[in-house]
């Protein structure tokens, strides 16, 4: 079975790469993003829209309401193994995402060392200026999406349920938006009515938060097997 693994920090174009590869190969993409398992966080977690998918198939490790919390890495890893097994007859699958905890679960498990041909695309963290330009563009799109709710609309809706607030405070983007509202002494719904100057500050702040997260991801990712090449058979992270 061919497994195409696309991973790297946030805001480095992994989803775009995965969609292009799916168009080329006809294979489905399985997201390795634990936050994307919550449809209520579609925009803020970076779930691509139907239009962005361009006719390709994208799968998720779970479909759960936020009140159940973000799926744990071990559970996500178990679901990942199940999905790979379910698609074995199709001959291949594209795995795409940046969950360091999930990727490290893979690195520690011998399951991935047998019967797979690996094709690995590792997106690296660019310099800060390049990253911030891409991140700001992404955040602006999240604030004004072509389809669906904006990240702020998602936040406002979920904020109305107090028990969800601690979960939101653990997720990049939503966390900074809540901090921004607090610092400026405004309510969450007032974030929907920001002038251009204030919105620019919000965009920059969220992008900065993404950059901090991306640097942390880069430090926590498991190392790709030094012996790996395109079509390599063995453990992708060289642990076994």
UniProtKB/Swiss-Prot annotation:
GO MF terms held by the record: AMP dimethylallyltransferase activity
Keywords tagged on the record: Crown gall tumor, Cytokinin biosynthesis, Plasmid, Transferase
Reaction catalysis annotation: dimethylallyl diphosphate + AMP = N(6)-(dimethylallyl)adenosine 5'-phosphate + diphosphate
Disulphide linkage map: none
Keyword rRNA processing: no
One of the protein's GO biological processes: cytokinin biosynthetic process
Known EC number: 2.5.1.27
Domain of life: Bacteria
InterPro entries documented for this protein: P-loop_NTPase (IPR027417), Tzs (IPR002648)
SUPFAM superfamilies in UniProt: P-loop containing nucleoside triphosphate hydrolases
Keyword Transferase: yes
Top-level EC class: transferase
Function: Transfers dimethylallyl groups to AMP as part of the biosynthesis of cytokinin phytohormones.
Family per similarity comment: Belongs to the isopentenyl transferase family.
Protein name: Adenylate dimethylallyltransferase
Biological source species: Agrobacterium tumefaciens (strain Ach5)
Gene: izt
